[in-house]
Amino acid sequence: RAMELGCDVISEKPMTVDEAKCQEILDAIARTGRKLRVTFNYRYSPHATRIRELLRDGAIGTVHQVHFEWVLDTIHGADYFRRWHRDKRNSGGLLVHKATHHFDLVNFWIASRPKTVFAFGDLVFYGRENAERRGVTRFYSRVHGSPQAAGDPFALHLAQNAALKALYLDAEKDDGYLRDQSVFGDGISIEDTM
């Protein structure tokens, strides 16, 4: 709509969530001649911006190659397996949902685009099947209202934190968004090892 009104558009990623809507946006660009910029907010964090400044100022010389690894621990990483991201049909997986920020950071830091990118992944820790292989026998769908969640170090107890309760648990009746699903439940199809 903004392009039809003569405006260029700046969008946070993702610009849309499916192929048909993406095609509508591309058609609007072709039809109106307007511009679209999809941005990544993470590049503007203070440490990311400082890295760019250091590289631009030649602090380590000319960069010829980048090997970039991001280790996502089970404290922050588990969150992706509690929420909507856990189903690859919703998120495209962490290589799409999370790693796009990492690719953008490298492009931002060295003011260049890659000639080759390689990535791979597998699901080896989270999900019911992997938990069963490790001997887990207590399963539950979500933490709230589940006695089986007691003692699970990965359980997110929304009701025990006033801020989380107000932000998320109390809003479920309106948005249906569950943030406390079991990371060892069924329906997890994204990779946890990349």
Language-model features and meaning:
Residues R1-R43, G58:
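Beta-strand-loop-alpha-helix segment that lines the small-molecule cofactor/substrate pocket
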Residues A20, G58, H97-K98, I188-E191:
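A generic fold-level signal
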Residues D8, H102-D104, D192:
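Acidic side chains
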Residues R34, Y42-Q181:
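Predominantly a Rossmann-like dinucleotide-binding segment in NAD(P)-dependent oxidoreductases
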Residues I29, D57, F108, D186-G187:
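Sterically constrained small-residue positions within well-ordered secondary structures
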Residues Y177, V183-M194:
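Glycine-enriched catalytic-core subsegment of oxygenase/oxidase enzymes
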